[in-house]
Amino acid sequence: MRQYLLDTNVLIDYLTLREPFGATAAALLRAGAVGKVRFYAASLSFVTIEYIIRRQTSTAQARQLLEQLAHVVEIVPVGAVTVRQALASDFTDFEDAIQYFTALTQPTIQAIITRDPKGFRASSLPVLSVAGALLELDNAA
């Protein structure tokens, strides 16, 4: 079974069905529901997602969506070591660095799925687009 860390942008696309990315993000998350893949998300992503969705809808709606998401992904805590690693890294985007070093805390994570692969140029893990992850899962079947 493949194991991926989902970047915050993919999770927002999925939860909000943001065009034109929402449909492919939903297709990817459905693969997890049928046991083809296991998904992880950084705990920090939940904070960011709540802030963004709350501004578009309501606090209650944001919390409801996050509760649903918590059943679909394994939440990986972001700790002090991860923050220090991100601060000392060559990543130009701090949030991407947090995602990357969070992924490294879980040795079973095989890739990071993002809509912004340029943000992960310093990554030693493979970085896939949502479409690339779907293709990889189809080829593994």
Regions found by a protein language model. Give the residues of each.
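Hydrophobic helix-cap positions at the C-terminus of alpha-helices
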Residues: 31-32, 69, 106
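Short acidic-hydrophobic, aromatic-tinged amphipathic segments that line or gate anion-handling sites
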Residues: 75-78, 127-131
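Active-site neighborhoods of divalent-metal-dependent phosphate/nucleic-acid chemistry enzymes
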Residues: 74-117
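Helix-adjacent hinge/juxtasegments
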Residues: 51-77
